[in-house]
Amino acid sequence: MAQLIDFQKVRRRMWRKRLHNLLFLAGFAAIVFGVSFLVYHNGNMDLRTAVNTVTAEFASGSGYPVVLPGGRLLGMSYMDNGLIITADSNLYTYNNTGRRMLDVQHGMINPTISVAGSRFLAYDRGGTKVMLFSRSNQLRQVSTDFAIYDGDMARNGNFALASRSDRHLSQVIAYNGDGNIICRYLFSRRPAVCVSLADSKDAMTVGLLDAQNGDFLSVISRYQFPIENPTASIELPGELILHLNYQDGSNIRAITDQRVILFNSDMKETASFSYGEQQLIRFQYGQDGKLALYLRDATGERKGRAVVLNDHLEALCSVPQNADPNGMALENGILYLSQSGEILLYNFTGKQTGHYAINGLGLIQPMGDTLYYTTGSELCTITSKEIMDRTSQRGSSKNASESSSTASQRRGSSEESESASSSSRRSSSSDAESSKMEQSASDRWEMVKDALLGSESEAASQDGEKTEKTSSSQPEASSASEASSISESDPESEVKE
């Protein structure tokens, strides 16, 4: 007898089998995608380190503020989805929920940070110690035999160190992400004081310093690994090279004591921004490539201006200041300045959009719309919108208070006028007395108003005097003909006077 076939059951069985195969392929694709994401997101880290890094990044903390560990804070830097705090003894990293991802003793006297994406290089300027980190792990440690002048790290994992040498005046050694030497460049006539790596290719620029006719002579050279000789060079007579920034494959920015210069890959100057008669005190790179400068007037006072430059070194804004800022940062079209315990916000038209006073204000570092700041014992956050809203509310309250005081004064004056008018109908002597009272009330209002304005001006002048006294305790700026040094905590640097 023929067996009947239930085609409905056959179809269901085939559909389940097909679904099983699709789920298996989807799971396999997810694993491949996850591994690819880890490799791309964390460069040439091993898989275990990459997994730990991503896990630490997304692990939840208790939020901000967080209590900072002991030690003197030296600097604060941003990295991809993380914050780096440099103390005199330890390095710390935090994610955006306040979770501490890294806590390690660095053992350096002058720790300096160079950030590249989700990793950063820590080296002892003037010392010999070098350490590489992810957000949550120490990747490796490299020891050099000679004092380090400068260092830089690229997103592709390469890093370079400019240092002294035994048989030559200086050297620059380029390493890959595993800490193996790619190239070694020796310089017998000039010390290499600056180095910057390209993120997307095996190339770097080196700044060399020399003297000519009693003045500085800076030389900038571009190198392509593993070619021994420079592919292009340029001399800058009379200028002191302070910092190099290899933006991408075709643009190189050089900061000297006199100007900021933009070069192409052939080291041909394409743009320049001069400081004029002012002196460079501080500079800061933004995450979008813009550059902020603080320039002090040559009058001997602590007055100056903060300038924001775009990628073509065109000035977007110039903000006058009556005192040197303690900190400066750029993010999302906002210039942040910290000064005398207050955070000042400016847009790129130069208009002040907010200000916020904070007791014990220390370091500042914006990431996105959030500003991270320290207060001595805590790491805190506030958004730029919150600062602007609070500024607006204070302004509205002040205007309302002034309007109320003015209305009250007008009512008082009106009542006194009516009283004076009534008294004048009684006697001429009373009229004279009423006039005296009205004039006295008016004078009192003017006196109170002047006192209020005067107290604000006096407070501002006292703040200025305090700032001036604090600043005057530091040595005055050296002239352009004298050797200067750079103290850099990447991405923010400050010229030591």
Please place each PLM-identified region on the residue numbering:
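Structural motif
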Residues: T128-M131, R167-I173, N213-R222, V260-F263, ...
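Repeated scaffold domains used in trafficking and secretory/extracellular systems
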Residues: G70-G75, M108-G117, F146-R155, R189-A198, ...
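A short beta-strand motif characteristic of beta-propeller blades
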Residues: A56-L68, R99-Q105, N137-S143, N180-L186, ...
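Short beta-strand elements that form the blades of beta-propeller/WD-repeat-like
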Residues: L74-T86, I113-D124, V130-M131, G157-D166, ...
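Solenoidal tandem-repeat scaffolds enriched in leucines and small polar residues
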Residues: H168-V260
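Non-cytosolic head/periplasmic domains of membrane-anchored proteins
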Residues: D103-A203, G207
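Blade-level signature of beta-propeller repeat domains, shared across WD40, Kelch, NHL, RCC1
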Residues: I364-G395
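N-terminal Lys/Arg-rich, disordered targeting/topogenic segments
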Residues: M1-H20
